[in-house]
């Protein structure tokens, strides 16, 4: 992501879109990159039309999202202070996995966000990840455990 911060002005939108999506998906903690601020990340994502960030399947999901969108985020002690991050998921089970990885007893949060503030949808790692402008997250709260027998979709 640091590379893109400096090269974005000379890249075509197509190249920037492909490289940004690839770098975002491959970086372990893109929300906590010390070299690229949230403001800079948001500017990078906003500088590229969404269809250039996603493959056709991802863009189809992106276009079909409800408005507003319910999103989830799993946090551990490592990132507990970074709830209002760019990276959320559409899938509560994925958020649950992130909240409990590394043997942690983390927390799953849920929020609502107007669709226009979702900058991309990525499913390259089967995480149903949405990149959001976090200042537009609404009704952030701890997500209640699903009742037994309920199936999360």
Where are these regions (language model features)?
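Conserved NAD+-utilizing ADP-ribose enzyme module
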Residues: 1-71, 76-86, 90-153
